[in-house]
Amino acid sequence: MIETWTASDGYPILVASWIPSQKPTARVLLIHGVQSHQGWYQGLGRRLAEAGFEVHLADRRGSGGNTQDRGHATSPRRLVDDIGELLGELDRKSPGIPTCVAGISWGGKLAVLAAARFPERVASLALVCPGMQPRVGVSRREKLRIAIAYFTNRRKKFAIPLSDPALFTANPVGQAFIQSDPLSLREATAGLLVASTLIDRAVASAPRKIKQPVLLMLAGEDRIVDNAKTRDYFDRLASLNRTILEYPGAHHTLEFESDPTLYARDLADWILQLGA
């Protein structure tokens, strides 16, 4: 089911939802990466719903099926506001259900900031190959061009440095999907790219604020994320309930692995045991 939810500033956001047949044991809000969108994670949403969870995944403003201001963001706060407002709306519709915010790739950064800023709405946090410590990025020259554009034309677009589908997966079918996906975000404005840099700074100072149970899922052959630095960051979280799962041989987007049910099942089992 896909519906349009309107943020407080009037921006219409597409939200995919998967509702279990029985009363949900918990709610999961999935947050996708910088290039991806809800279409990449239909399988994960369905599998989590089959495990008994109410699941939602909103296309980030300017990405996926949200065509208004394509590739743009006005500020980091606005992106985190969207998550907080959606969490509030979901709580109003179905009160009393604990929510796990699960951030995937670049979405892991937003998930961390949401958990830090809205602890009363986020019962647990899952980080799936999160992009806090990336191995890829723009060159110094490109950074300078982006900085100039930020002060002269914030809607000027630049290529996102993730053009090779092999960065995401070694699966030929997954690579073909990414290559031909018309909704993948391949360019971002100076506004979004500077917002991402500011988000990085906020994420760096967030560990002391993360006190919820946290799950970190890592792909052993990740070419986008620096796993060692990500583990170091994870160890600094204030949470006393931290779990790490690593998938040897897996690449960045676990959804494109030969058996995507594995990480979905592990995520579901972890959320379920929190309520035991």
What are these regions (language model features)?
Residues 35-37, 64-94:
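Catalytic nucleophile-loop/oxyanion-hole region of alpha/beta-hydrolase
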Residues 243-276:
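Catalytic active-site module of serine/aspartate enzymes centered on a nucleophile-bearing elbow/loop
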Residues 212, 226-235:
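Short alpha-helix in the alpha/beta-hydrolase fold that links the catalytic acid
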Residues 221-225, 253:
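Acidic catalytic loop of the alpha/beta-hydrolase fold
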Residues 210, 216-218, 222:
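Short beta-strand/loop motif that positions the catalytic acidic residue
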Residues 104-189:
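Alpha/beta-hydrolase-fold enzymes
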Residues 1-20:
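N-terminal cap/lid segment of alpha/beta-hydrolase-fold proteins
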Residues 45-68:
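Conserved alpha/beta-hydrolase
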